[in-house]
Amino acid sequence: LKCHKLVPPVWKTCPEGKNLCYKMFMVSTSTVPVKRGCIDVCPKDSALVKYVCCSTDKCN
């Protein structure tokens, strides 16, 4: 699986076990992603951050 890093079109190949791509947003400004990459489990939302995940190449 290949996931975008913080700024597309830069991407990286995910390590084994982290087979989801994610975008992380601050809940207060949920329009601009603050982080992108590979993640093992989703969703992982909290009071401050929201994760949007997917399982196909470069879909974040």
Curated annotation (Swiss-Prot):
Keyword Membrane: yes
SUPFAM superfamilies the UniProt entry points to: Snake toxin-like (SSF57302)
Gene3D superfamilies: CD59
Compartment list: Secreted; Target cell membrane
First-listed, main subcellular location of the protein, grouped into a coarse class: secreted
Any one GO molecular-function label of the UniProt entry: toxin activity
Name of the molecule in the record: Cytotoxin 1
Organism: Naja nivea
